[in-house]
């Protein structure tokens, strides 16, 4: 691979090739990033809902046990 780029100017290696790669694989990169972000968002919502459920159940259990003590 290095033999291919040896005679070329620096801007071909560092500007043109990455730009061409982004143009060719840009849709794939965007879809993968979108999938990962969506998955992380769903995971965050899941954790928040489970945490809220645990909080509500503990709050309810503590209030019902304190009522039975009376």
Swiss-Prot record:
Q: How is this protein positioned relative to the membrane?
A: Multi-pass membrane protein
Residue stretches in coiled coil: none
Which keywords annotate this record?
A: Cell membrane, Membrane, Transmembrane, Transmembrane helix
Q: Which domain of life is it from?
A: Bacteria
Q: Which InterPro entries match?
A: Uncharacterised_SCO3924 (IPR020246)
Subcellular localization, per the record?
Answer: Cell membrane
May I ask which residue range the UniProt record assigns to the signal sequence? none
Name the Pfam families on file.
DUF5326
Name assigned to this protein: Uncharacterized protein SCO3924
What organism is listed for this UniProt entry? Answer: Streptomyces coelicolor (strain ATCC BAA-471 / A3(2) / M145)
